[in-house]
Amino acid sequence: PHMWVGRLSFTVPGGTGYCSATAISNNHFVTAAHCVYDTTSNYWYSNWYFTPAYRNGGAPYGSFRATSCTILTAWQNLSGSFSINGWTKYDVAVCGVGTNSAGKTLNQMVGWAGRLWNSSYVKNFFNMGYPWNDTSNYPLPNAGMYLRICTAESRQQTTDTLGMGCNFGGGISGGPWMIGYAPNVTSGWVNSVNSGIYVGQQNLYGIRFTSNN
């Protein structure tokens, strides 16, 4: 399942942004909406490139450019600065991709993770992504270069919002909360993606996937 998860790069005003993402079916990836659309300026980012199994600059399966991204209307209608309570439950995006430089599709190269809806709020999750710092803004070794994994039990934060304790910071956004993951076994279902953190606390927050979103 490690090959399903990768680093997402994209163009933002004045530079490049980074998030995490996961390959899903029909040659799409799932990530956080704030990695796609800025509610502060009502601005779509651009040039999204998903690199599954990214490792220290390496792209073993190639990179895949997004051809389209979809977010919830509720996210696009938000304005102002991000708030975990009231915003996280809309913070998800799905993007379709073209082929890599070898002409291969995303699903041909890495397969895809399953998705799970309407699960209970309390679950044991594996949280994955490419953070460059921890929740205290302390830089991690080889920041953003390697996939990191944390496991913890989730809890209900607000309606359709989950929380769990992991010491990951920026760059983890969009990474999957996975159920049924096991190393070296091709299994796992995405039930949330990383949305926000509280600096100084070992907490991550994410949308709870339901049949309504």
Task: Tell what function each PLM region has.
Residues 167-193:
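Catalytic nucleophile loop of clan PA
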Residues 3-55, 148-158, 165, 210:
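Catalytic histidine site
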Residues 86-165:
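Chymotrypsin/trypsin-fold serine protease catalytic domain
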Residues 35-37, 54-58, 99-103, 131-133, ...:
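Acidic glycine-/aspartate-rich tracts in secreted/extracellular proteins
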Residues 191, 197-213:
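C-terminal cap/linker of serine protease catalytic domains
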Residues 1-3, 9-14, 45-103:
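Conserved catalytic-core segment of clan PA serine endopeptidases
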Residues 36, 66-76, 132, 167-170, ...:
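Short, solvent-exposed aromatic-acidic interface loops
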Residues 3-5, 16-20, 26, 45-47, ...:
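Extracellular structured ligand-interaction cores
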